[in-house]
Amino acid sequence: MNTKERKTVEKMLVAFNTNFAMQDEVKVRKIKEKFLKNFTVDVTKNPQYVIQLLETAFSEKNAGDVDESLAIGFMFELFSESFSDILRKLIEADWHFTHEDIASIFQELKLPETVECLYKAALKQFEYLEYDEFFALAVKCIWALGAIKTDAAKEKLKLLARSDNEIISRNALAQLERM
């Protein structure tokens, strides 16, 4: 992501966060229009560009660019199966801070190929989440596994249900009951 793109994303995020509480669809639409006018590529017509931004951020280990690229994806609802490869790599990487966002994307996409990385992420202790006594990332990964509903997802939930961590175990059992 170049400097101009970063500034455009940052302006969009500031404007969106400032106006978000109002839930004003007109203002949100204007923010999106202004972003598309000023950004290098019309991401609504070329979501592959956001994948490229994520791949570059991954190879450069640029946490800020991962965060901002995901923000573009969320703002314009771009996430699809085509994002799977890069997001699977990112959810296992330990140098950024957007694991929960990626787990939420996987929950929406319900892709069987994400089962293994979701399971690993549910168990991984990322340094920046050491304070999280509620294990939000693990819970989001468990809910994503529950949404996938394949035999492989069910097997991973069974393993998680045997966890010594009560929060992980309880959430995995709840997802198994829903399946």
Task: Enumerate the predicted regions with their spans.
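Intrinsically disordered, serine/threonine- and proline-rich low-complexity regions
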Residues: 1-52, 77
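Amphipathic alpha-helical scaffolding segments comprising HEAT/armadillo-like alpha-solenoid repeats
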Residues: 3-11, 44-57, 78-93, 111-127, ...
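Generic secondary-structure transition motif, activating predominantly at the C-termini of alpha-helices
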Residues: 17-20, 39, 54, 58-62, ...
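Structural detector for internal amphipathic alpha-helices that build alpha-solenoid repeat scaffolds
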Residues: 26-44, 56, 60-79, 89, ...
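A short, hydrophobic/aromatic-rich structural module that often spans a beta strand
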Residues: 155-179
